[in-house]
């Protein structure tokens, strides 16, 4: 049901990401939408009115985590300092083979708590036991694009994954008052043969859902695709017609200028995961070049096992610093652009049209940062302070779909201590074998 409480945020600094301006305003939320932004807003019906004091706070759109595997919080810290393929083959995949639906449920809740407490209001997920992830999303109040990851090197496994994905989409698309949407998620071009990808494309068109896929993450992947198909991952997927469907492409680390133009032409959402790419030594995505070319670039954390946190404020800062040092240009990926990648541009990359901006008529997905901490003084430039000084712990209040799901750092729907206990118990057992 739509939240019936009217919320009025008074006297706050509102970030306008269309004009890249910060204005002192009130925000009125009615139902699940922002109904008015302005000065000295008055509400006649005060019976169902909640007033939030926005002084010493800045309101910005909820952060959007464009790529993660949220239940992988269960494997955080279990194995680090390994190359991607060693890490997957020797640690992660063996541990994941022991996963149960209940494990994924508690691991997802742990990740969702972490995301809410650091200001994320929407995430795009690819994993297993997705019914359990959906239940966690439904229970928590967060917004998500959910997809069941599919690996099809074994045709029987691919067929099973596609059937489960279709069943999941038909069951969950648009549920939780529209907070849950879905996608088809072939893992990557090196784990999904062409004929399988063609089946996925056909089903995505039939179901009218996007495709969520890892692309060009490592040099090993590039070598595998070149050896098998004589081309690069982006060109390979284009030749199959995959980009004719709305595509969310995670990583896109190793792409050339021609491939960047392909991404632009098809409006592929390129999700940059800077901390995961650095930690696994996958490489540095040419984000500045992509943005200059007009590619829709969002940000993601990847799973907590390869990051190792889900803090999007850290991620937008890492993205900016990485582009600056790799190009030896301090002007690369400035503060305003990195914030946009985590909000408005990130929403466009995922194909979401009603979130990512504080705008009348948009869904009320809003976070309030407490700017009365020492890291926000002196108040020279709020965009610079958010991009380069803020921390996830500065998030004071989180509103999703017009409902307050965290206020003054306290979750309103979830039992954080129980979630930490259950996730810890299960994570330790999974890795121990």
Curated annotation (Swiss-Prot):
Reactions accelerated catalytically: S-adenosyl-L-homocysteine + H2O + H(+) = S-inosyl-L-homocysteine + NH4(+); S-methyl-5'-thioadenosine + H2O + H(+) = S-methyl-5'-thioinosine + NH4(+)
E.C. number(s) listed in UniProt: 3.5.4.28, 3.5.4.31
Residues annotated as binding Zn(2+): 67, 69, 214, 302
Gene3D superfamilies named among the record's database cross-references: Metal-dependent hydrolases (3.20.20.140), Urease, subunit C, domain 1 (2.30.40.10)
Keywords, sorted A to Z: Hydrolase, Metal-binding, Zinc
One MF annotation (Gene Ontology) recorded for this entry: metal ion binding
Required cofactor(s): Zn(2+)
CDD domains noted in UniProt: ATZ_TRZ_like
Cofactor note: Binds 1 zinc ion per subunit.
Matches recorded under InterPro entries: Amidohydro-rel, Deaminase_MtaD/DadD, Metal-dep_hydrolase_composite, Metal_Hydrolase, MTA/SAH_deaminase
Binding site for substrate: 96, 148, 187, 217, 302
Pfam families: Amidohydro_1
Statement: the UniProt record of this protein carries the keyword Metal-binding: yes
Function: Catalyzes the deamination of 5-methylthioadenosine and S-adenosyl-L-homocysteine into 5-methylthioinosine and S-inosyl-L-homocysteine, respectively. Is also able to deaminate adenosine.
Family affiliation: Belongs to the metallo-dependent hydrolases superfamily. MTA/SAH deaminase family.
HAMAP family: MTA_SAH_deamin
PANTHER family: AMIDOHYDROLASE-RELATED DOMAIN-CONTAINING PROTEIN, AMINOHYDROLASE SSNA-RELATED
Protein name: 5-methylthioadenosine/S-adenosylhomocysteine deaminase
The organism of origin for this protein: Carboxydothermus hydrogenoformans (strain ATCC BAA-161 / DSM 6008 / Z-2901)
């Amino acid at each position: 049901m739509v939240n019936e409480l009217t919320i009025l945020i008074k006297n706050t600094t509102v970030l306008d990401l269309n004009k890249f301006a910060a204005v002192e305003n009130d925000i009125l939320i009615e139902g699940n939408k922002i109904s008015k932004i302005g000065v000295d807003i008055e509400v006649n019906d005060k019976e169902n009115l909640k007033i939030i004091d926005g002084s010493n706070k800045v309101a910005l759109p909820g952060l959007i985590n464009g790529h993660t595997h949220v239940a992988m919080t269960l494997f955080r810290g279990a194995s680090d300092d390994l190359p991607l393929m060693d890490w997957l083959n020797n640690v992660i995949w063996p541990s994941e083979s022991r996963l149960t639906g209940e494990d994924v449920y508690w691991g997802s809740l742990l990740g969702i708590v972490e995301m809410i407490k650091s200001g994320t209001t929407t995430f795009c997920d690819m994993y297993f036991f997705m019914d359990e992830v959906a239940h966690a999303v439904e229970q928590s109040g967060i917004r998500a694009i959910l997809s069941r990851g599919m690996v099809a090197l074994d045709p029987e496994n691919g067929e099973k994954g596609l059937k489960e994905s279709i069943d999941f989409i038909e069951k969950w698309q648009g549920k939780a008052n529209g907070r849950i949407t879905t996608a088809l998620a072939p893992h990557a071009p090196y784990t999904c043969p062409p004929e399988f990808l063609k089946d996925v494309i056909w089903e995505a068109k039939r179901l009218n859902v996007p495709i969520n896929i890892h692309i060009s993450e490592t040099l090993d992947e590039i070598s595998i695709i070149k050896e098998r198909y004589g081309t690069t991952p982006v060109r390979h997927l284009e030749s199959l017609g995959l980009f004719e469907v709305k595509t969310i492409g995670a990583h896109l680390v190793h792409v050339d200028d021609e491939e960047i133009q392909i991404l632009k032409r098809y409006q592929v959402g390129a999700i940059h995961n800077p901390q995961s790419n650095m930690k696994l030594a996958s490489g540095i995505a040419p984000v500045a070049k992509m943005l200059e070319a007009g590619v829709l670039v969002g940000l993601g954390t990847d799973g907590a096992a390869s990051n190792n946190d889900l803090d999007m404020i850290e991620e937008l800062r890492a993205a900016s610093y990485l582009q600056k040092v790799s190009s030896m240009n301090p002007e690369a990926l400035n503060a305003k652009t990195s914030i946009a990648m985590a909000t408005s541009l990130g929403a466009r990359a995922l194909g979401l049209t009603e979130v990512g901006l504080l705008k009348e008529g948009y869904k009320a997905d809003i976070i309030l940062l407490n700017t009365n901490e020492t890291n926000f003084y002196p108040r020279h430039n709020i965009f610079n302070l958010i991009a380069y000084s803020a921390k996830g712990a500065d998030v004071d209040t989180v509103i999703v779909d017009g409902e307050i799901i965290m206020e003054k750092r306290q979750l309103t729907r979830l039992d954080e201590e129980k979630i930490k206990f259950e996730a810890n118990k299960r994570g330790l057992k999974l890795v121990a074998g």
